From Swiss-Prot:
Transmembrane segments: none annotated. InterPro entries: Nucleotide-bd_a/b_plait_sf, Ribosomal_uL23-like, Ribosomal_uL23/eL15/eS24_sf. One of its GO terms (molecular function) is structural constituent of ribosome. One of its GO terms (cellular component) is ribosome. This is Large ribosomal subunit protein uL23. The gene is rplW.
Length: 100
């Protein structure tokens, strides 16, 4: 896999109450990823950027919500979410910027 492509796969960490719960209970980290990203690309990108070992990757396509603004109906953009399972003993800490 091209290293340039791997840098474009991960868009942002998904930081929310649910993401924190999943991280504590299941040792998983949630990322927003490119819509055309595959599981092997996501795994390689996380291992390259954060220097951790990945056990598995699950993905989910999130549909955009229908919203109204001043009477006009529009739709938010859909996106892809990746649940990355880390091997035991591995950790990614976004607050301190890097792995712990």
């Amino acid at each position: 896999m091209n290293q340039e492509r791997l840098m474009q796969v991960l868009l942002a960490p998904q930081i929310s109450e649910k993401a924190t719960y999943v991280a504590d209970k299941y040792e998983q980290v949630i990322f927003r990823v490119a819509s055309d990203a595959t599981k092997p690309e996501i795994k390689a990108a996380v291992e390259l950027l954060f220097k951790v070992e990945v056990e598995g990757v699950q993905v989910a396509n999130v549909k955009g919500k229908v919203k109204r603004f001043k009477g006009a109906t529009g739709r938010r953009k859909g996106w892809k979410k990746a649940y990355v399972s880390l091997k035991p003993g591995q950790e990614i800490n976004f607050v301190e910027g890097g792995n712990a």
